[in-house]
Amino acid sequence: MTTIESKEEQAVGQDIAVTIVDTDVHPLPVSPEVLRSYAPAEWKDKLWPTGNAVSPVPHFYDTPDSYKTMSLRVDAAPPGGGVAGSDPDFAAKQLLVDAGVSIALLEPMCDAQLPHAEHVLKGTYNDWLANVWLGENNWHGRWRGALSVTAQDPELAAREIERWAGHPYMAEVLMTPQTRGIPFGSPHFDPMYEAAARHGLPVATHLMGQTPFELIPIYPVGNPAHWHDFFASWPLLYVSHLMSLVFDGAFDRHPELRVVFVEGGFTWAMPVMWRMDRIWEQRKADLPHVRRKPSEYVREHVRFTTQPLEEVDVGTYRRYIEMMDLGGNLMFSTDYPHWSYDSPDWAIKRFPPDQRERIMRGNATALYRLPSTVKALPGEHGDVAV
């Protein structure tokens, strides 16, 4: 494994072409105390009353060592100590140098039950992310951050967006899909959508949580008992939100809004688009505000990250992508440093050759307005930009 030199010895290399953009990476704090140091004084003990920022025991069966690893790759733990995903330089060594990722989007996982508590917690994470990952540890300029906001109070979310608008490395807004019964297309979210669209920031959603009751959504038949139940059911949330975004008119109210569904895969989107198109054709009189086919809204406004990829052959993926013309809507992701990580070398072979460039790089580069070249890290061998 290649070693990145200390900051004092780092020399930024030549320009190399951006070939892989990872749209789902999870940075973690070294300890709860680190986060506490960024929280307002009156909230420190309220947010971490026991000194633990994560649930101390697994709340459904995950992996055999989930209690010890928090579902993280054991080999991603920094040699100097700490949990996987807590050391920016070691993450850069594994993800940027060894795995060949050119630019990675960092999405912290944090949530809270009460609206104002959630707002404060998200703001705390934003301050930590900006300082620890997007500050001096982003000397290479290859980390991008997700700006976390509360879904429960969109006015506070809009305020947080305004606080970070213009930051050179904050690339998107991040919210939970666990919205307590309010679908994404509801006007409830309009203040947040308006602020995000005005500043050209896509709104991403990723399941998250601080406690067992927040992490696991309640499905029609109750809570999942095992990790595979949970993971297979995850897209159910996204199906509901996607239909609401289209049928409840969010994209008509906010023509510049872009939404990213993270870590739910994408194969579920095709049958949903078919069904929405059929309903729209049959019941246009009931949907006068939906001016185009629902599938057209999806192609223009929605992106899906690829992880977790189903292990099917290239021909199957080609048929899926071509059926609803979704090649321009998929963005590669690894889910580093979780054990469910999809490596770039493995994933790229699943995509049709003529779709690989835009899935691995092009779609994300366009959405997040990323550069076409980056500076090579020590030990990295990329395609030299000309």
Q: Which ranges hold each PLM region?
A:
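Hydrophobic alpha-helical membrane-insertion segments
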Residues: S31-E33, M109, L215, F261, ...
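Internal helix-loop-helix
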Residues: A117-H119
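Catalytic pocket-lining loop regions of alpha/beta-barrel enzymes
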Residues: T3, L134-N137, R142-W143, V149, ...
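Short, well-ordered beta-to-alpha junction loops that form the rim of enzyme active sites
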Residues: V25, V101, E107-C110, S148, ...
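Mid-to-C-terminal alpha-helical segments outside catalytic/metal-binding sites
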Residues: T2-V21, P29-D98, S102, D127, ...
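Divalent metal-dependent hydrolysis catalytic cores, especially in the metallo-beta-lactamase
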Residues: R73-G81, K93-P115, R142-S148, A171-M175
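A short, flexible beta-alpha/helix-coil linker loop
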Residues: C110-L114, R180, W339, P344
